[in-house]
Amino acid sequence: MTTDMGAATRPQIAFSYNGYSLNDLPGYKNEMDLTGVRDSITPVSNGQLQVTIKAYENVIDSLDYTVYSIDGKEKLLEQKVKKPGENATLEVGNVDGENILSEERMLQITLHMDNHDMYYYTRIVDGAKLNAAPSLDYVQSFHENALAKAEGVGIGTAIEPSDEGDNTTLQHVTIHSDYTHVTWGNLAPKVDGSERWTIKELNSTYMAVELEYRVNCTGEENEQDEYQVREYFRVRYISGSQKTYLLDYDRTMDQIFDATKKVLNEKGVLLGITDKNPV
């Protein structure tokens, strides 16, 4: 398997849905087994997918996209977009008047360049049918309110503090942690740069979303320390009551080492917040 997940020299693909930028897809140099690339699932709006393409220095001649059954055995739709530019709209909802998003499907996108192709994969579903928008809105609200340490906005009633939560550290926070730890203690973090949102699962029961981003916090020596954060949500939207419930929450943060900053004081090495059990 050859993937170029972080290389800026390779084109990058993401999707827009209801104002959210979602699912930055890794690019593969070779076609993949469709049953082995299930890391993300992308909601479709009114039969259309809005694709954002960062070409960098590459010249993209055309884009092919193919919709398959989820097991990859049946090809349902195949289309081409010439000179797609930075944004493209993919029509994926209907074939000969028949709705092909009545169930989960697999999407393959191929970018054709001068001397090579790149392949991208995601599962796709009907976003409105599975209440994707209100679920994403809930995640965004919880995420932003936790960062801001906002009170009276439902965080305290959504979490389930118990002995399962480790309230001695901010490195790993869960739905079982207390309100103080879920809302970042005294760190007052500021998001640095963009956030990467990946929908890991979306079905009739729940949505699972993972956020990746960096934050700046004041460290032990009153300097700004930077941390890499992963924040996971599993939520359920109930159409009848129009309410969203938090089913699971898990957040980790690890300090990004900066050799230009002071790393020693009279107490020894300044470690910041890191995993107690690094791999």
Predicted regions and their residues:
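Core segments of small alpha/beta cavity-forming domains
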Residues: 3-64, 72-74, 104-187, 267-279
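Solvent-exposed serine/threonine-rich low-complexity stretches and specific carbohydrate-binding patches
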Residues: 70-88
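Surface-exposed loop/turn elements that mediate protein-protein interactions on large endomembrane-trafficking
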Residues: 70-73, 163-165, 171, 240-269
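Aromatic sugar-binding surface patches on proteins
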Residues: 83-95, 263
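Surface-exposed, short loops/turns at beta-strand junctions within beta-sandwich domains
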Residues: 94-104
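Hydrophobic/aromatic beta-strand elements that line small-molecule binding cavities or substrate pockets
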Residues: 195-200, 230-236
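A short hydrophobic beta-strand element
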Residues: 200-215
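Short, cysteine-centered beta-strand-loop-beta hairpins and adjacent loop/turn segments enriched
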Residues: 212-228
